[in-house]
């Protein structure tokens, strides 16, 4: 179908691939960075005639060029074969395809097709065919090596560029398939639900491009209007090969979707012809049109490529700036198992018209490009052809590609593990790199939306990850979409950040990619089957929601939304897509076992779902550029809008495989909310991810029963039960078709889909909700109505009620009512799977973590369930719930809802979007009429009030919900209105009766169980009965939300997990029960309405569900105990909580103003208790100074010395004889030696008045004062040495003279040495040389080495010294300083910086007199300073001893002789005066003791209050210590842990406020030895989140500010760049890893 992805070197990094080159026969030509004129995109002839011979390549705009060097020149890689005649191979090709159309499960034919393509060096198509052969049972031993060889060849070609430019001799398999399948479509057109299947549009129709397209290089222009693409190649029109994704069904308004065509090939275009000329056309907007598989497949490759070298195509697939020929859709995509060739996938993704200047090649090569240039939409939009249109244009992508992708989606999702290349399809994150391949236009246009696979994620992932779905990789293997960086709220911002910030901080590695123009919002448009991409969950009604989400959702919901006008209905989130995949029964493929997922996918599934990675799982089928469609939906803030939906998804992805983690590293991800993986953690505790033993088996049985029930329901609904669809076909179809197929049908599918189908399932589920979905997978796709038509009445689309339900569920996202009974699940065959995934968290993909697994499971719900109880557990209830009232894929809706809230810059505010959604839902409900609901059992009715899913519906009702919704009569609508009113009343009533009703409901449910002998699942939502649960769900806003919350209460964007979690379904119940308990009527249940309303009222809440099996007699009861995850208030956090709890609570916290919580807990204080009330006698006011006399070196290294010095009760310790015992050579610090070593070294000089040490007189000498004169100046060591020497000589001279005078006047006894007791009135001026820096290790090497002889705790540097963990130099603290003194030199009173300890050694020859006061009295001394008009922290003051004594403050006073070491303990207030000529050396030490740490933090906070700089960045130091030191002291551990806790809270609160405000946050990791940052204005430490401005607009000087100062400069932070130095995941990991170490026994 598509040419193999270009090898890394094949094209210029920034070169985009021209879609025109995609024409089946035309030579491949790379597109210029911008989309070429539409002509370039014109598809080759679609008729069989054109298939035989390649049409002339569409004229490329001058800019189109394949050569990396010259875009305007066609470039053929050296040695690339030129187009050759097909000879007779076309006939063989047609014959094989025709045979496969009849029966896809013919591995021999697939292998033959592969050989045909291989003979023509079309490794992409050959690989797809071989993969399909494997899917259908081909010999892996034989095909595996071939695939590996082809992939190697592709990779090589990709690097050489040969295959990229080589014209395809044989038409792409997808083209042929589509053309031949047209006949089938014509026959079954009506079934598909769209207008009768169109014949493939003639090439001319497709080729003609509006002049705009031709002229516009932008992706939008490049993409021709939907009509053009539709005509050219409607994926929907043409059947797709089994392996190919199903084209999304057109979104025509025809009321009844035509019966689904027979399932030709799994991937065949069972979807209606691509009728969405405008509406239905596959467009970036209608990402849905593309089959999930394709969507998933193409984008995934790109994404994956970036991440995994193994991927054959490291570069992003060429982006088709113009509409690629529709027929060019990924026809060759392997129908089944094998992932699509990466190249194909990449080709499959059209660049969503990328604005000029945004080159994909750039994205590939440059990180910025990957991150920012590649728009998530672009990635998602990647389709073999130009599936996505510019955001504003209708999708150009052909339906066929869509269908093909959908078909393949499943299989692609679960490529055979053994198949080489499976690795390629790894994660959306990987895809991102691939998406880089897309033409710039693709990226640009798609930026708003992710590729189907990444569609949802793309929102979160502005960068590449979102754009192309990762190549199909084993479902389990495929990592979920990029995690953290995909966060919903930040998604959009993230995307923008990626571009803007990258440009700002990383520089645009390529021409900046203009943000893709927002796709026109289509209110009514439920994208074509974008099921794959739940991303599109957003409704058209939620334009604020990023377009990307809409696209996904439209794809997934295309079927369900098709008929319903509910543009508002959001498309199911990725999780749903996954589900949809699951529903289709499919034989386990090598990659996926029916029981594959041990729930592994579940965890991944949720995460992947957001990025549409679920779809990606689909054997690399190309994703629709569905994300573009979302973009269309929200043109205003495509980037931002998308961000939010992906946010939830991205969150889910966080837990996803590391691959995703890589993505977060991107700049764009900077914007993501805390890390992706973490978010998952934050969202869901591991315990919730584990199902009880034996649950997997139970779930299998439930799946089977659900499948049967679904089939029955489908029949009842008037829709033929979806044929099992040959397993291969089903597998292929499952990506989208799965919706129609019971979720439970294929455990294997579930596994594969779990990961990738999460998104697909979401979409699928919506489809399933509609009766038509029961038809083969293609029909579900076909079902999707044109996005623009919100009211299409086609039967296949869900009724407005179902759509509303979906929307409600989506909005509710995380809060799903889990009907314990499986009946609800079984009620809807299709919806069931959907329901399972319906919990796609809106913004809480992250929240889904616990749920994320569940949604995944749901995505492949039942199958997955059987294989992994986890999945099935969540899936069943969700399915049921969905069926009942949330039928419209709630998940998608949830993502939609979250996106609006998440979207920061979106056109509308979150509240506005939610309000709009709520109104839309009500309208839908009214339209639909609630006839079905009314018939529902009373209990059901009550329950529906809370959650439509919970209510039991008669089989008829179930049918109606499943497919009859569209046909709801006017009376039904009236009833719905009435029901809505009832819902409101119930909601209010529930608030009052939440406590009682749950139990009553439970009792009723239990009573029912005995009556029903079939297995039944009782949903216990926090002790809520089904009724109560429903009601509570209806009123998510209720405080009772905690109970019903799981189903009803919307999960907070950050906590989407509940949506998935609630899904831990009770196993599905037999069809009979399902019908009985089927969720409310097709009309939206009150619960759904309430959910929607509640969503608008606030974020959904998380809900955890556990399935408990209860056996009694012949009955097996499954109690889905929904453990409502109580929201932790930030104030309730303690150090016992994990980082996930901290992040979650902090994100949900609402803080007014600045976050000012202390880093210290008063309860942790270790200060000694000193009785200050007792009046001390005079002798105690002069206590003896703690002293130690060292007699040997052994004494110096005794632990007792450390304990004595650091004892909080000893403010100061003098160690006598230290130099002698350690044999320190103090001569190294003598003035003479210093002058010789560096005589020109700077010395700070303090000019003072010489006075007695215990006195401090004013200038008049009449009274003592506290202020101390000490003016500052500078000189050199040599000059000060001269002054010191001369001062000494003068002193000697004066001494001699005084002696002579004494001898002459022996009677005189009043004389006193001037130096010791100068007359205050003499004002003898002296100079004190201080703060001489000896930090230069080279210059002062001998001196510093001598100090290494000291005990470890006294050394300048040691592991036990906090100052050694600062990471940078702090002069005078973690470096040595020298003081040169003359008699009278004073060191005024002070406490050391941040209350750290200090070491001072007197070098001699003179003495120093010390005064010290315990830290306990510092406040009293500070008060004295204030009274005397001197600043305690920064001023020079000399205490009046009498004042201290009068205040009952004991003062330690002693003399320090040469060789004595003084240890100043933490916080000790001290002042020193030299009594002789001497030098001193000193430095600070921060022993790791609780006392030291407490005092350091106290002073840190006090400095902030006093606007004084804390020289020691305590928060920075605390994190460094936590990462590098093992703490065994419980008190110290608690203090540090608490500090980290507060730091994380501060970061999260600050981050969330910025994200909510729409401010982009760029990630800029720290580098080695990078200093801590301080605010340029207030000198407060700025940790992690920096507010940077450029000084005077200069690029050379950047200033860091704290948030307060930055906002003072600009309230809206205009002109301020916000940088993030640590990802939330990094901090969380350090936080959780910091544990109390066992105490050492060495002592």
Swiss-Prot record:
Q: Which reaction does it catalyse?
A: N(6),N(6),N(6)-trimethyl-L-lysyl(27)-[histone H3] + 2 2-oxoglutarate + 2 O2 = N(6)-methyl-L-lysyl(27)-[histone H3] + 2 formaldehyde + 2 succinate + 2 CO2
Keywords linked to the UniProt accession: Chromatin regulator, Dioxygenase, Disease variant, Inflammatory response, Intellectual disability, Iron, Isopeptide bond, Metal-binding, Nucleus, Oxidoreductase, Phosphoprotein, Ubl conjugation, Zinc
Q: Where is the composition biased (Basic and acidic residues)?
A: 291-307, 359-370, 704-714, 916-929, 990-1003
**Which compartment or compartments is the protein found in?**
Nucleus
Spans annotated as Disordered: 52-88, 190-680, 704-807, 822-1096, 1288-1325
- Which part of the chain is the JmjC domain? 1339-1502
Q: Where does Fe cation bind?
A: 1390, 1392, 1470
Induction text: By 12-O-tetradecanoylphorbol-13-acetate (TPA) in myeloid leukemia cells.
Protease among the record's keywords? Answer: no
Which SUPFAM superfamilies does UniProt cross-reference here? Answer: Clavaminate synthase-like
Q: What is its main location?
A: nucleus
List every position bearing Phosphoserine. 224
Instruction: Spell out the Gene3D superfamilies in the cross-references.
Output: 1.20.58.1370, 2.10.110.20, Cupin (2.60.120.650)
Summarize the subunit comment.
Answer: Interacts with TLE1. Component of the MLL4 complex, at least composed of KMT2B/MLL4, ASH2L, RBBP5, WDR5, and KDM6B. Interacts with TBX21, SMARCA4, SMARCC1 and SMARCC2.
Q: Which disease is it linked to?
A: Stolerman neurodevelopmental syndrome: An autosomal dominant disorder characterized by global developmental delay, variable intellectual disability, poor language acquisition, and dysmorphic facial features including a prominent nasal bridge and coarse features. Some patients manifest autism spectrum disorder. Musculoskeletal features may be present and include widened and thickened hands and fingers, joint hypermobility, clinodactyly of the fifth fingers, and toe syndactyly.
Instruction: Please state what the protein is called.
Output: Lysine-specific demethylase 6B
Native organism is: Homo sapiens (Human)
Gene (UniProt): KDM6B
């Amino acid at each position: 179908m598509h040419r193999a992805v270009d090898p890394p070197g094949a094209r210029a990094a920034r070169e985009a691939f021209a879609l025109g080159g995609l024409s089946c026969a035309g030579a491949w030509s790379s597109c210029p960075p911008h989309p070429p004129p539409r002509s370039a995109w014109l598809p080759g002839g679609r008729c069989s005639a054109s298939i035989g011979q390649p049409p002339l390549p569409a004229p490329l705009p001058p800019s189109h060029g394949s050569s990396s060097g010259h875009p305007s020149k066609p470039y053929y890689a050296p040695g690339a074969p030129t187009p050759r005649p097909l000879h007779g191979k076309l006939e063989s090709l047609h014959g094989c395809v025709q045979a496969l159309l009849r029966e896809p499960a013919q591995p021999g034919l697939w292998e033959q097709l592969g050989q045909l393509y291989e003979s023509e060096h079309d490794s992409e198509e050959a690989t797809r065919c071989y993969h399909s052969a494997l899917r259908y049972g081909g010999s892996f031993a034989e095909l595996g090596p071939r695939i590996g060889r082809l992939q190697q060849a592709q990779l090589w070609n990709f690097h050489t560029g040969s295959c990229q430019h080589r014209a395809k001799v044989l038409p792409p398999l997808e083209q042929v398939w589509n053309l031949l399948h047209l006949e089938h479509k014509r026959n079954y057109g009506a079934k598909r639900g769209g207008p009768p299947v169109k014949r493939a549009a003639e090439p001319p129709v497709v080729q003609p491009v509006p002049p705009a397209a031709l002229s516009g290089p932008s992706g939008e222009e490049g993409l021709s209007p939907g009509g053009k693409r539709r005509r050219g190649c409607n994926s929907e029109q043409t059947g797709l090969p089994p392996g190919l994704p199903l084209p999304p069904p057109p979104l025509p308004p025809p009321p009844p979707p035509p019966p689904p065509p027979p399932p030709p090939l799994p991937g065949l275009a069972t979807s209606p012809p691509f009728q969405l000329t405008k509406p239905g056309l596959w467009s970036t907007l209608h990402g849905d049109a593309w089959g999930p598989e394709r969507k998933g497949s193409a984008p995934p490759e790109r994404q994956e490529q970036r991440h995994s070298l193994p991927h054959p195509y490291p570069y992003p697939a060429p982006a088709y700036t113009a509409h690629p020929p529709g027929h060019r859709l990924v026809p060759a995509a392997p129908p089944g198992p094998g992932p699509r060739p990466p190249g194909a996938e990449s080709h499959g993704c059209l660049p969503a018209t990328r604005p000029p200047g945004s080159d994909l090649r750039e994205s590939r090569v440059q990180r910025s490009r990957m991150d920012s240039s590649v728009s998530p939409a672009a990635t998602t939009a990647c389709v073999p052809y130009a599936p996505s249109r510019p955001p504003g244009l209708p999708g150009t992508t052909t339906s066929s590609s869509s269908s093909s992708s959908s078909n393949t989606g499943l299989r692609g999702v679960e490529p055979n593990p053994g198949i080489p290349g499976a690795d390629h399809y790894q994660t959306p994150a990987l895809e991102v790199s691939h998406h880089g391949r897309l033409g710039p236009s693709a990226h640009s246009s798609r930026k708003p939306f992710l590729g189907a696979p990444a569609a949802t994620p793309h929102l979160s992932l502005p960068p590449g990850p979102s754009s192309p779905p990762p190549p199909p990789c084993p479902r389990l293997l495929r990592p979920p979409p990029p995690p953290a960086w995909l966060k919903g709220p930040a998604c959009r911002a993230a995307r923008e950040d990626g571009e803007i910030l990258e440009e700002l901080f990383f520089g645009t590695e390529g021409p900046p990619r203009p943000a893709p123009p927002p796709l026109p919002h289509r209110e009514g448009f439920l994208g074509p089957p974008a099921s794959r991409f739940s991303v599109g969950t957003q409704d058209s009604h939620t334009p604020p929601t990023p377009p990307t989400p809409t696209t996904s959702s439209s794809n997934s919901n295309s079927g369900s939304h098709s008929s319903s006008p509910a543009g508002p209905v959001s498309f199911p989130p990725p999780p749903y897509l996954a589900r949809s995949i699951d529903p289709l029964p499919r034989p386990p493929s090598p990659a996926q076992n029916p029981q594959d997922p041990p729930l592994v996918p579940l965890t991944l599934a949720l995460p992947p779902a957001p990025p549409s990675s679920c779809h990606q799982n689909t054997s690399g089928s190309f994703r629709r550029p569905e994300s573009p469609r979302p973009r269309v939906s929200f043109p205003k803030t495509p980037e931002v809008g998308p961000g939010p939906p992906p946010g939830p998804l991205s969150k889910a992805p966080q837990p996803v495989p590391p691959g995703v983690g890589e993505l977060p590293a991107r700049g764009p991800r900077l914007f993501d909310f805390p890390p992706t993986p973490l978010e998952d953690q934050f969202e869901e505790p591991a315990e919730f991810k584990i199902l009880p033993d034996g649950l997997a088996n139970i779930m299998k049985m439930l799946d089977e029963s659900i499948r049967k029930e679904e089939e029955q329901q489908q029949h009842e609904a008037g829709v033929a039960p979806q044929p099992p669809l040959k397993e291969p076909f089903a597998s292929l179809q499952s990506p989208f078709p799965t919706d129609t197929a019971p979720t439970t049908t294929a455990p294997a599918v579930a596994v594969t889909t779990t990961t990738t189908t999460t998104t697909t399932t979401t979409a699928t589920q919506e489809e399933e909700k509609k009766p038509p979905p029961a038809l083969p997978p293609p029909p579900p796709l076909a079902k999707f109505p044109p996005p623009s038509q919100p009211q299409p009445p086609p039967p296949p689309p869900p009724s407005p009620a179902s759509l509303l339900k979906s929307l409600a569920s989506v909005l509710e996202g995380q809060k799903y009512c889990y009907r314990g009974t499986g009946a609800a699940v079984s009620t809807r065959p299709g919806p069931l799977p959907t329901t399972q995934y319906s919990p796609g968290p809106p913004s809480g993909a992250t929240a889904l973590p616990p749920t994320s697994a569940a949604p995944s499971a749901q995505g492949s719900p039942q199958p997955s369930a059987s294989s992994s109880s986890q999945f099935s557990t969540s899936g069943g209830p969700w399915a049921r719930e969905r069926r009942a009232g949330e039928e419209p894929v709630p998940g998608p809706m949830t993502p939609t809802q979250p996106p609006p809230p998440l979207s920061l810059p979106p056109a509308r505010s979150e509240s506005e979007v939610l309000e709009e959604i709520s109104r839309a839902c009500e309208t839908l409900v009214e339209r639909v009429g609630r006839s079905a609901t009314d018939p529902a059992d009373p209990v059901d009715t009550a329950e529906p009030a809370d959650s439509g899913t919970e209510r039991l519906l008669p089989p008829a009702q179930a049918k109606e919900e499943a497919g009859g919704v569209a046909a709801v009569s006017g009376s039904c609508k009236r009833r719905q209105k009435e029901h809505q009113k009832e819902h409101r009343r119930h909601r209010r009533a529930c608030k009052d009766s939440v406590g009682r009703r749950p139990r009553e409901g439970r009792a009723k449910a239990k009573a029912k169980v005995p009556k029903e002998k079939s297995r039944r699942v009782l949903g216990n939502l926090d002790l809520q009965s089904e009724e109560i649960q429903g009601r509570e769900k209806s009123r998510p806003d209720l405080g009772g939300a905690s109970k019903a919350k799981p189903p009803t209460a919307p999960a907070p964007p950050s906590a989407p997990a509940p949506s998935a979690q609630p899904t831990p379904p009770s196993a599905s119940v037999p069809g009979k029960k399902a019908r009985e308990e089927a969720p409310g009527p097709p009309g939206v249940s009150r619960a759904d309405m309430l959910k929607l309303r509640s969503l608008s009222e606030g974020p959904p809440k998380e809900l955890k569900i556990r399935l408990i099996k209860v056996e009694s007699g012949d009955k097996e009861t499954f109690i889905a105990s929904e453990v409502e995850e109580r929201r932790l208030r930030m104030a309730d956090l303690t150090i016992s909580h994990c980082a996930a709890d901290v992040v979650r609570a902090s994100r949900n916290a609402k803080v007014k103003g600045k976050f000012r919580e202390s880093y210290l807990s008063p309860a942790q204080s270790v200060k000694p208790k000193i009785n200050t009330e007792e009046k001390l006698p005079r002798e105690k006011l002069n206590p003896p100074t703690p002293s130690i006399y060292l007699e040997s070196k052994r004494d110096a290294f005794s632990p007792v010395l450390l304990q004595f010095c650091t004892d909080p009760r000893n403010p100061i310790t003098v160690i006598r004889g230290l130099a002698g015992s350690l044999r320190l050579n103090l001569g190294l610090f003598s003035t003479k030696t210093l002058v010789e070593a560096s005589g020109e070294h700077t010395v700070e000089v303090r000019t003072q008045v010489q006075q007695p040490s215990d006195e401090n007189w004013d200038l008049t000498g009449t009274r003592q004062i506290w202020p101390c004169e000490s003016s500052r100046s500078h000189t050199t060591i040599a000059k000060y040495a001269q002054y010191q020497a001369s001062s000494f000589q003068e002193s000697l001279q004066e001494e001699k003279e005084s002696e002579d005078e004494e001898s002459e006047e022996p009677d005189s006894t009043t004389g006193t040495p001037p130096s010791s007791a100068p007359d205050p009135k003499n004002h003898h001026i002296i100079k004190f040389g201080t703060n001489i820096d000896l930090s230069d290790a080279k210059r002062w090497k001998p001196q510093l080495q001598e100090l290494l002889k000291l005990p470890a705790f006294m050394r300048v540097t040691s592991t036990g010294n906090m100052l050694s963990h600062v990471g940078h130099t702090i002069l005078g603290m973690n470096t040595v300083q020298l003081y040169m003194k003359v008699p009278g030199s004073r060191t005024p009173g002070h406490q050391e910086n941040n209350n750290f300890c200090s070491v001072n050694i007197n070098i001699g020859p003179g003495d120093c007199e010390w005064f010290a006061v315990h830290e306990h009295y510092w406040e009293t001394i500070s008060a004295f300073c204030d009274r005397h008009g001197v600043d305690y922290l920064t001023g020079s003051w000399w205490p009046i001893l009498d004042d201290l004594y009068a205040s009952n403050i004991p003062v330690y006073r002693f003399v320090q002789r040469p060789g004595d070491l003084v240890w100043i303990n933490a916080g000790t207030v001290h002042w020193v005066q030299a009594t002789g000529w001497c030098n001193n050396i000193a430095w600070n030490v921060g022993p790791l003791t609780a006392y030291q740490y407490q005092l350091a933090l106290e002073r840190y906070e006090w400095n902030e209050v006093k606007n004084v700089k804390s020289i020691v960045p305590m928060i920075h130091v605390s994190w460094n210590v936590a990462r590098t030191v093992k703490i065994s002291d419980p008190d110290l551990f608690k203090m540090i842990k608490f500090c980290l806790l507060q730091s994380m809270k501060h970061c999260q609160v600050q981050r969330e406020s910025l994200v909510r405000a729409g401010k982009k946050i760029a990630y800029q990791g720290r580098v080695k030895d990078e200093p801590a940052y301080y605010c340029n204005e207030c000198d407060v430490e700025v940790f992690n989140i920096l507010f940077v401005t450029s000084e005077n607009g200069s690029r050379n000087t950047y200033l860091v500010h704290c948030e307060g100062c930055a906002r003072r400069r600009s309230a809206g932070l205009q002109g301020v760049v916000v940088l993030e130095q640590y990802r939330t995941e990094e901090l969380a990991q350090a936080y959780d890893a910091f544990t109390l170490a066992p105490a050492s026994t060495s002592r």
